[in-house]
Amino acid sequence: MARQALLQPGSVWSLFFLLVALVGYAFVFLLPPLILSMLARLFGRWPGYGVAVTGSALMLLLLLVDGQIHDLYGFHLNGFVWNLLTTPGGFTSMGGGPDAVFSFVLFALALVVFEAGLLFWSLRKPVPRLRWGWMVTALLLCMVGERAAYGTAHFLAYRPVLNASHAVPFYQPTTFRGAAMALGFEPVRTRDKLDVADQGRLHYPRQALRVAADAPSPNIMVLVAESLRWDMLTPEIMPNLWRFAEERGIRFTDHYSGGNGTRMGIFSLFYGLPGNYWFAFLDARQPPVLMSEIQRRGYRMGLYTSARFSYPEFDKTVFADVPESLLHSDEEGPGWQRDRRNVDRMLSFLDQRDAAKPFFGFLFFESPHARYYFPEESVIRPDYLKNFNYATMDLEQDIGGIFNRYVNASHHLDQQLGRLLDGMAERNLLDNTILVITGDHGEEFMENGRWGHNSEFHNQQVHVPLVLAGPGIAPAVMDKPTSHLDLAPTLLSRLGVENEPRDYAVGVPLDQVPDDRYRLAASWDAVAYLGPEYKVAMPVRAGGLFEMAVSRADDTPVKDEDAVMARLQSRLVEVLGDMSRFFSGGR
């Protein structure tokens, strides 16, 4: 994989980075066998030699296996792949067989013989006296140079170096974006037109979009609420949205976000991809094909958030090609006040836009975000925690009052949704506008021992409401298992895109969802298989080799995790394909 990175078109800086990074990490990889062999020398010279030969061969074998996995799937050895390789039958399910096992064993033995040969050659041939001072100095310079090069490339969005870093096994990046901004430097946001080197490890989309000659261009409005879980959508808590869904839209009762946090939830909604792709798309400043198609058609943009577009970095991913002047953030005051102002701004945008052009609207609401603020007129649960102080609260005792705050905040959110929907009705926009109303992720209140989100894949953290309305959509209730990953294929199909969804997404249009499907959700460092019977959380970072978590679909424990993993092998191999299809070399 390093060879491939060196052969890609790039720059002197990417070559420098890769060389110094490989030197530094080679030392890191040699440390375990070096330390173990030194300890073994306490029992004699030959035990030390044996550990040195075996340890070096095993480490080299691990790196070669990691390189092969990276070439095939676009990511390094992690807990997910490790489990498939070590579970009985797992290697076969990935396409391996007896011949492959035999070849692997022969290759491992050959490495041991090779390392033993190097050892005996070095023992028979005088070795020059090592200048340890110079070696340590050179090693430190390599490590500092590699980290400085990566940090600078990350801040300047210099893709050749960022792409090269993915070739280094188990690479741990260092960034200094916050420190640079504190000194007055501004990070690079916009991306230039991608060339072959910039595309790096992405193969997205797999086929260029084909659009029907008579493709419609309806208005699109995407309304997403922070931390909104599915059971808030009731006639009591959210009467406006409930009534709107009853009269005009489809209410999806079994809908999962693609993440347990904002970053992966929004990413999955716009891209139709699981969150393990986030980092590569961020490095490449690659927007989703949905936004590229909308911009190609000249849609007018009304984009508002009560948080920030820069964190998570949606200005460098979802909206990477949108001029910064069109990204409107409001960070003043509590979330409910920001939501009110942004609804006002969205209504003003609808009044002032060029009516001859279709529009794309996006509004991100903050009302349900912890600490769940709301005005007095939004109180429907009066028994709420009045003084919400993280330092003094007793979580076990106060969780009921905290949940009631959340309910009141969700009710305020509904009031703002009602204002916007009524405003669109007054402007005669509901009949020709596709509306998507959902949450970025859910929120847990100790139902399974956690509070908040971003920690587990419990239903309370990933189960969100979804209402879809627009031209040709009749009121209905859908109980099939749907996902945020299905929204991009749904919208693109309604825009007249003729490609199969697998050309650009992992999800499927909402009206084509099978009953027995699995869904995917992601966190910063894991992807979860969410099946009809079981859940499996799989670490995607290289360091999490043994951190698999298996439960039933209702989040209760299973008795035999290994048996469940063996039963799910074929499905998990499919997941592996989903996680690698849009990397170079993916299938």
Locations of the language-model features?
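Transmembrane and membrane-interface helices of multi-pass
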Residues: 1-171
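Active-site-proximal alpha/beta segments of enzymes that process anionic O-linked groups
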Residues: 138-390
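A long, amphipathic alpha-helix that forms part
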Residues: 170, 343-351, 386-433, 586
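Short beta-strand segments
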Residues: 224, 256, 303-305, 360-367, ...
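A short beta-strand-to-alpha-helix junction
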Residues: 281-288, 400-413, 456-462, 473-489, ...
